[in-house]
Amino acid sequence: MLKTISPLIPPTLLKVLAEMGHGDEIIFSDAHFPAHSLGPQVIRADGLSVSDLLRAIIPLFELDSYAPPLVMMAAVEGDTLDPSVEARYRDALSLEAPCPDIVRIDRYAFYERAQKAFAIVITGECAKYGNILLKKGVTP
């Protein structure tokens, strides 16, 4: 156990966060996301919500300030988004600094970004469109 680091962060995730460089991207996915078929390293965080993990890692993780650091999947045509999902994520990400805007991209563009991500963290999140990409910035 490490002091001041949330026990919600699995050791493998802590290692990945430390190994990431500026500009690297990580996905925090809902439980339904096809992470294992997309290619990058997969970390399991079953039983945890995305917002709980975001709240745990944001004190350790600098968001990119040169490019949009937050990306979520847009709803498929004819479907709807639950605005409370983004609101929960924004609240969690606002603990250290004001939360930057969240960019929405279509499902297949999100999958392409996920294939190139440093890692994908599968959570127990059950919210539809509950996936979020974080781009790492330079630590001041």
Swiss-Prot record:
Keywords: Carbohydrate metabolism, Cytoplasm, Fucose metabolism, Isomerase
Alphabetized GO MF terms: fucose binding; L-fucose mutarotase activity
Record EC number: 5.1.3.29
Biological function: Involved in the anomeric conversion of L-fucose.
Protein name: L-fucose mutarotase
Gene source species: Salmonella gallinarum (strain 287/91 / NCTC 13346)
Assigned GO CC terms: cytoplasm
UniProt main location, coarse: cytoplasm
Database matches in PANTHER family: FUCOSE MUTAROTASE
Subunit-level organization: Homodecamer.
InterPro entries noted in UniProt: L-fucose_mutarotase, RbsD-like_sf, RbsD/FucU_mutarotase, RbsD_FucU
SUPFAM superfamilies: RbsD-like
